[in-house]
Amino acid sequence: MEETPPPMQAGSKPHLEKLTLGVTRILESSPGVTEVSIIEKLPAERHMISSWEQKNNCVMPEDVRNFYLMTNGFHMTWSVKLDDHIIPLGSMVINGISKLTQLIQSSVYSLPNAPTLADLEDDSQEGNEDHQLEKPHFDCRSAIFELDSCGGNGKVCLVYKNGKPGLAHDTEIWFLDRALYWHFLTDTFTAYYRLLITHLGLPQWQYAFTSYGISPQAKQWFSMYKPITYNTSLLTEEPDTFVNKLDPSKVFKSKNKILIPKKKGPVQPVSGQKGPGPLAPPTSKPSAGCGNPVRK
């Protein structure tokens, strides 16, 4: 049985800091982030790995083996504080060996004449955008083991492409969404672990590797806490709709015209102007007549 000690602060032990690739310091320095913690797990014993390989008839890849020899699973969480309310947000999970179980038909489909996972093979071909890669099969052609249940948003799986006996070099990491469509993630477990850490365990981050992307709600969290080395252009729902593509040289073209000043005419004198103005021409008074004066 796996032990589940109480969560510890991320920076309390040096080996935990090494395990998280230093991402804890980034989270703790981010605004609003609180309660960054890791559930410390003991290393798996070698006989546990050998027992898993014998039980499942699969050889565990070397990087997966080395991971379990360092820690029997991984669980790191962090929360955000908004308006005095603490909201759990980030979650990074790698199942321990006892939970690294094969993905098989659920008991829900065990009723007579009920559809099986194998019946979805033809339908799932439509949802696979990785046409150059052979997708996993739910039947004996592939051996699929669950690494993370993604909080009910899908499943991250370790896939042995050629079924059993499973060889270590035939493994890949795939994401199975809620519609049971497969999406390729990485060639190796090490590459996937780096993706998990650099995406900070944000909700639904695996959907960034699908054709339909993350949900609008998840985009809001991605905008607030951008994953490390994340392509921010994916946060735009429809670039053609929301990105303003105006050409400034055309918009302000009319302002670049040379204005020709108009010529001004002579200034007319103002009647109320102070100071000496132009002299009016003299006016002659009418005379009574010429020659002798008139007698009464």
Curated annotation (Swiss-Prot):
Localization per Swiss-Prot or TrEMBL: Cytoplasm, Cytoskeleton; Cytoplasm, Cytoskeleton, Microtubule organizing center, Centrosome, Centriolar satellite
GO cellular component entries: centriolar satellite; cytoplasm; microtubule
Chain ranges passing through the membrane: none
Sorted UniProt keywords: Cytoplasm, Cytoskeleton, Microtubule
SUPFAM superfamilies (UniProt xref): SMI1/KNR4-like
Segments of this protein annotated with the region Disordered: 257-296
Subunit and interaction comment: Part of the neuronal tubulin polyglutamylase complex which contains TPGS1, TPGS2, TTLL1, LRRC49 and NICN1. Interacts with CSTPP1 and LRRC49.
Function: Subunit of the tubulin polyglutamylase complex (TPGC). The complex mediates cilia and flagella polyglutamylation which is essential for their biogenesis and motility.
PANTHER family found in the cross-reference section: TUBULIN POLYGLUTAMYLASE COMPLEX SUBUNIT 2 (PTHR31854:SF2)
Protein name, UniProt field: Tubulin polyglutamylase complex subunit 2
Organism: Rattus norvegicus
Gene name in the database record: Tpgs2
